[in-house]
Amino acid sequence: MLIILKKIKMKKSFLISLCVCSLFIISCQQAPKVVDTNPNYEKNLATAKKFFELFNSEDLDAQIPLICPGVTHYPPFYGSEPGKYDEFIAAGKGWMDNFDEITYNAEVWLPGTDSLGVLNGSVRTYGNWSAKNTASGNVISNRAYHSFEFNGAGQIHELRDYFDGSGLMAAAMATNE
């Protein structure tokens, strides 16, 4: 009788060990790769890249068709409020008038999601800006994050800039005294 109980106990131990090992092996499998299924992402990504390319070449007129007339821009300055089309165009012109050798080097481009985590065709990017101030000659460099939302026509209808815009301007205007 004792031998039978030991065999039953060993079978239970073996089955439990087998279940634990199986669960471990299953849990170690790689998660499926997330693929952007939003058909607008590639087109919107090309628009965002073109927007930066035109900013780097200081071609505001060529940028304008990429921007929705109802755009909302969230600038990177302390205490700033969202601006609409005219403020956005003026801000871009201000950067271009006050800086030369403007470059944005994107480190990564990513698809964006809505508030529920669903891929929505929006575009995000992390990168580094550098430029030379025309008044002081100071060269500035700053890491940045930008997010773009697009309308049905593929134009930028919301742009959010995240970087230290106020500190950047202070560095650009600093004197060497």
Predicted regions and their residues:
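Bacterial Sec-dependent N-terminal signal peptides
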Residues: 1-39
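Short, low-complexity N-terminal intrinsically disordered segments enriched in polar/charged residues
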Residues: 28-57, 61
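Hydrophobic pocket/interface hotspot
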Residues: 51, 62-64, 71, 88, ...
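A solvent-exposed, acidic/Ser-Thr-rich amphipathic alpha-helical stretch
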Residues: 60-115, 119-121
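Short beta-strand segments enriched in hydrophobic/aromatic residues
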Residues: 67, 75, 123, 127-131, ...
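Low-complexity, intrinsically disordered terminal/linker segments enriched in charged
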Residues: 157-177
